[in-house]
Amino acid sequence: MKIKFNDVTYTYQQGTPYEYKALDHINLTIEQGKYYAIVGQTGSGKSTLIQHFNGLLKPTNGNIEHDELTIHSKTKDKFIRPIRQKVGLVFQFPESQLFEDNIEREIEFGPKNFGMNVEEVKERAFDLLLELGFPRNVMSLSPFQMSGGQMRKIAIVSILAMNPDVIVLDEPTAGLDPKSRQQVMELFKEIQLKQNKTIILVSHDMNEVAKYAEEIIVMNDGNIIEQVTPKELFRQGSKLEEWHIALPDIVQLQRDIEIKHGIKFKTIALTEKEFVSMYQEWQHHEE
């Protein structure tokens, strides 16, 4: 599924003294099968933007094209419903939305509402839960007897199992332990690569953004100010400070080495493997 924003503006409480423009003439194209990250400081418009992807919010002005359907301010909810099946949105702390007394019923809830094949969804969910380290009797267990990290994984799986074309993730690893963070992020990447899914990640963790995203959308004050690759973004030193975007740890290490040795690497590395190769090449050149 391709999603295209055409001059989209969104205003909260329009026509009242509390009117606030959260999105300002957004033009954006999301291509099928790519991994995007949306970054920017709190209040930049990220959460408002992602709620437009599946029609939870409708543009005040402009429109959004989802393949055959165009959403604008007057589009009725009954026409948006199919979009919500194709675009899965995982909110921050999705475990707070769990309410069924066992995991099987929790997994069934979404597909029943959309008239989907419940057994197929449950089978996909079971496979995903096993991949994330749950026991084989997981479906009969209560989510409320599990740790916060396990509940997060269950909530995420309940969305992934419905097999959306586009998966929108709002800070999906916030509060998780390092092992769970890696498990969840690797699962998203695997789904993108193996199933040609579109991933849209909102995150303040630039280590995750640098490692997984192919394209980064930078937001500030309701505007998109950059849409670039990770390497293009993280070589912009002073602008990153202006936008309140931290460097990934591996890039910060490179900067520290450059300052210490008075050198300048030809490029930047976004992974430990890339950095080791680049550093060894520099050492060899020095010898």
UniProtKB/Swiss-Prot annotation:
Subcellular compartments: Cell membrane
CDD domains per record: ABC_cobalt_CbiO_domain1
Root EC class: translocase
One MF term in the entry's GO annotations: ATPase-coupled transmembrane transporter activity
Topological relation to the membrane, as annotated: Peripheral membrane protein
Binding site for ATP: 40-47
EC identifiers of the protein: 7.-.-.-
Annotated InterPro entries: AAA+_ATPase (IPR003593), ABC_transporter-like_ATP-bd (IPR003439), ABC_transporter-like_CS (IPR017871), ABC_transpr_CbiO/EcfA_su (IPR015856), ECF_ABC_transporter_ATP-bd (IPR050095), EcfA2 (IPR030946), P-loop_NTPase (IPR027417)
Annotated Gene Ontology cellular component terms: ATP-binding cassette (ABC) transporter complex
Keyword annotations of the record: ATP-binding, Cell membrane, Membrane, Nucleotide-binding, Translocase, Transport
One Pfam family of this chain: ABC_tran
ABC transporter domain segment(s): 3-246
UniProt superkingdom: Bacteria
Similarity annotation: Belongs to the ABC transporter superfamily. Energy-coupling factor EcfA family.
Quaternary structure annotation from Swiss-Prot or TrEMBL: Forms a stable energy-coupling factor (ECF) transporter complex composed of 2 membrane-embedded substrate-binding proteins (S component), 2 ATP-binding proteins (A component) and 2 transmembrane proteins (T component).
Annotated PANTHER family: ENERGY-COUPLING FACTOR TRANSPORTER ATP-BINDING PROTEIN ECFA2, HEAVY METAL TRANSPORTER
Protein task: ATP-binding (A) component of a common energy-coupling factor (ECF) ABC-transporter complex. Unlike classic ABC transporters this ECF transporter provides the energy necessary to transport a number of different substrates.
Entry protein name: Energy-coupling factor transporter ATP-binding protein EcfA2
Naturally occurring in which organism (per UniProt): Staphylococcus haemolyticus (strain JCSC1435)
Organism lineage string: Bacteria, Bacillati, Bacillota, Bacilli, Bacillales
